[in-house]
Amino acid sequence: MSEPQDTTTAPSTTAAPMPTSTSQDSPSAQQPAQVSSATAASAAATAAAASAAVANPPMNGTTTRPSEELSCLWQGCSEKCPSPEALYEHVCERHVGRKSTNNLNLTCQWGSCRTTTVKRDHITSHIRVHVPLKPHKCDFCGKAFKRPQDLKKHVKTHADDSVLVRSPEPGARNPDMMFGGGAKGYATAAHYFEPALNAVPSQGYAHGAPQYYQSHPPPQPANPSYGNVYYALNHGPEAGHASYESKKRGYDALNEFFGDLKRRQFDPNSYAAVGQRLLGLQSLSLPVLSSGPLPEYQPMPAPVAVGGGGYSPGGAPSAPAYHLPPMSNVRTKNDLINIDQFLQQMQDTIYENDDNVAAAGVAQPGAHYVHGGMSYRTTHSPPTQLPPSHATATSSASMMPNPATHSPSTGTPALTPPSSAQSYTSGRSPVSLPSATRVSPPHHEGGSMYPRLPSATMADSMAAGYPTASSTAPPSTLGGIFDHDDRRRYTGGTLQRARPETRQLSEEMDLTQDSKDEGERTPKAKEHSSPSSPERISASLIDPALSGTAAEAEATLRTAQAATEVAERADVQWVEKVRLIEYLRNYIASRLERGEFENNESGGGNSSSNGSSHEQTPEASPDTHMEGVESEVPSKAEEPAVKPEAGDVVMYPTLRAVDEDGDSKMP
């Protein structure tokens, strides 16, 4: 009956300080009377409610009844504290103690608990289990916990993964953005891309967040606070800087490559030197490695809006444009022409490489190289019908006449088709000819972009040491009389002789024998040959005459597979070199077509009246002189203009012919 006594004494204590407020005393007196009547009817229910209120305090850790005290249940202690904080401090200081005061107790004696720890921090954390103190509050649902580890376990119950990557700092981010919230303004969420998106007006979505960010949530969700999302700005300013640095490295490497060409730093007729020099350009971002030849002054493209939002009324922010300086090694038209000639020599060297020509007879890798939008043939077989003239994929006309174009009926092929039954040694191989006798592939503009193999006359083939059997081969049609429709695949590093089809027939005919003894011996030979039959199917490119036992056949098969892989890698490298050379030639040709070069000759006519027209010639410019390519400066052959007569000005120099004796005479 202590509860009714407490409630009845409450009015007397509250009415004492306010004797004059009689109008407010009657309601305060009626309320305790109603509570006392209710508790008198159900005393047990009231006690249960009071105990529940003590066991489950509110989230801030305070109780609903300030006058209620919390008892310490430590063994032998009857202390009462007014708040959970005071109770926790009492247990830690009085019962746990400290090592410095020589009263440290690492065993919990709260009620029947006898938990023992090894450190004071551990037992003080354990005391929170018994004390109704919940200082750790969940930022998402507001639920409070006693220990930090309990809060961590609770956070994991939130299903959304974006909760786990949320920054715990207060005010760092809006929690609604974690769950991909719907149509909210997000006007204040400008923390990720503030430096890059200052010019974009902050506007909210009227139709919800874009589907792009809902279906593909990134580890750090992209900022949906703007109606327009631009690719050029989502990456921040670092992406544009990295792109500029990458393009500048490729641009400088290309300029250095052109400078090495001018100074003849490597031999363009050596396949190894050409491949080693091109290797440094293949891994760089060149200004020409795109759909077509582009100028080096290439600004960044305009940003494209994604995510369903159109451009804002204020307009998209202008993308930062960068400009690269002009190449110092390709400034004049003469530089471009001579570098194109160097590239043509390198292209001829790649096409006439011994390894690639000998890989599959006449079916060299260049035979399946097609320009068609920089696409290549997927098979190694040569085309069924070859046009009368072929050309590699170049965009500029050839700089010199090429004697390789011919009629299909005027000579024999310089390289015998691989279907011939004879093999060549190193001394009699078609590719062992001197480099001077080779003919570079022609370069013509036209619809057909197949490179044509060189041809040789009967006298040339006989003088070069070709067998007489090759003189009966057809013209450069790559074996056109053998199988026009179903072409065989010519791979590198393997024999080209087909498997005889009569072996299985001979095994079937061995079933009929003349004598019994021979019939008994025959199946024994078949037993040894039967296990190798599945392997012979997979090793169809190996000559059956070279196969022996099963172990030898397996070793030969592995060797052939390794050789095929090496040949495929070499073919891929060859195609990359050809592609890079074609890009470089397209780049030079495009600059010649657009006129992107310095005209140093334009000032010669204006200064001729001063008698210095000969100083403006291309040969006098230090930038236009090409070592090893240009002939000597024709200073003796070309003389400056004659002195003008009275009243007549001659604007053009007069040339004098030079005879064999060195005496010059006027024409």
UniProtKB/Swiss-Prot annotation:
GO cellular component: cytoplasm; nucleus
Modifications the protein undergoes after translation, according to the UniProt entry: Activated by C-terminal proteolytic cleavage by signaling protease (probably palB/RIM13) at neutral to alkaline ambient pH.
Gene3D superfamilies: Classic Zinc Finger (3.30.160.60)
Region (Disordered): 1-45, 371-537, 597-667
Subcellular location: Cytoplasm; Nucleus
Keyword S-adenosyl-L-methionine listed: no
Molecular functions per Gene Ontology: DNA binding; zinc ion binding
Compositional bias ranges of the Basic and acidic residues kind: 513-529, 622-646, 657-667
First-listed, main subcellular location of the protein, grouped into a coarse class: cytoplasm
Position of sequence motif YPX[LI] motif 1: 450-453
Biased composition annotated in UniProt, kind: Low complexity: 7-45, 391-400
Ranges of biased composition (kind: Polar residues): 404-438
This protein's record includes keyword Nuclease: no
Induction: By alkaline conditions.
InterPro entries cross-referenced by the UniProt entry: pacC/RIM101 (IPR050806), Znf_C2H2_sf (IPR036236), Znf_C2H2_type (IPR013087)
Keywords: Activator, Cytoplasm, DNA-binding, Metal-binding, Nucleus, Repeat, Repressor, Transcription, Transcription regulation, Zinc, Zinc-finger
Zn finger (C2H2-type) location: 70-95, 106-130, 136-158
Motif (YPX[LI] motif 2): 652-655
The protein's role, per its UniProt record: Transcription factor that mediates regulation of both acid- and alkaline-expressed genes in response to ambient pH. At alkaline ambient pH, activates transcription of alkaline-expressed genes (including PACC itself) and represses transcription of acid-expressed genes.
Family membership noted in the UniProt record: Belongs to the pacC/RIM101 family.
UniProt-recorded name of the protein: pH-response transcription factor pacC/RIM101
Organism: Aspergillus niger
Lineage, opening ranks: Eukaryota, Fungi, Dikarya, Ascomycota, Pezizomycotina
